[in-house]
């Protein structure tokens, strides 16, 4: 997320790296927005995988967060919130509402899974 680096001077990867070194968790659950070039995916699905994620890959940040990098399982959850067409990126006017709704769905699912 470019805002993380912009506001803190630290990339998402660096923040996660510091937390993992300090707290030594048994798993990373990474949630991030995704860019898509298919309009039918925009605000319309949730991607879940165990192969990791590259936060900021749409803006050419390419440090992968995965089991090989950190030595612990990584569950990556991505939501396509940005439509990428050529070099331009677009969001819908109601992206804030979509984030609120989607974050509720994801957090409820994680709470049901772990608690």
What are these regions (language model features)?
Residues 1-3:
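Short helix-loop-beta-strand segments that form the rim/entrance of peptidase-like active sites
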Residues 6:
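Active-site histidine-anchored catalytic micro-motif
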Residues 9-13:
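Short glycine-rich substrate-engagement loop in P-loop NTPases that contacts/grips substrate
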Residues 14-63:
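Glycine-rich phosphate-binding loop
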Residues 58-81:
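Short, flexible loop segments at boundaries between secondary-structure elements
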Residues 77-115:
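C-terminal functional extensions of proteins
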């Amino acid at each position: 997320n470019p805002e993380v680096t912009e506001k803190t001077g630290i990339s998402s990867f660096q923040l996660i790296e510091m937390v993992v070194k300090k707290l030594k968790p048994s798993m990373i659950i990474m949630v991030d927005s995704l860019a898509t070039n298919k309009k039918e995916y925009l605000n319309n699905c949730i991607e879940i995988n165990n192969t990791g994620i590259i936060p900021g890959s749409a803006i050419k940040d390419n440090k992968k967060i995965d089991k090989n990098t950190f030595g612990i399982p990584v569950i990556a959850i991505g939501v396509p919130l940005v439509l990428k067409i050529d070099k331009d990126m677009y969001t819908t006017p109601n992206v804030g509402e979509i984030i609120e709704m989607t974050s509720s769905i994801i957090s409820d699912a994680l709470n049901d899974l772990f608690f």
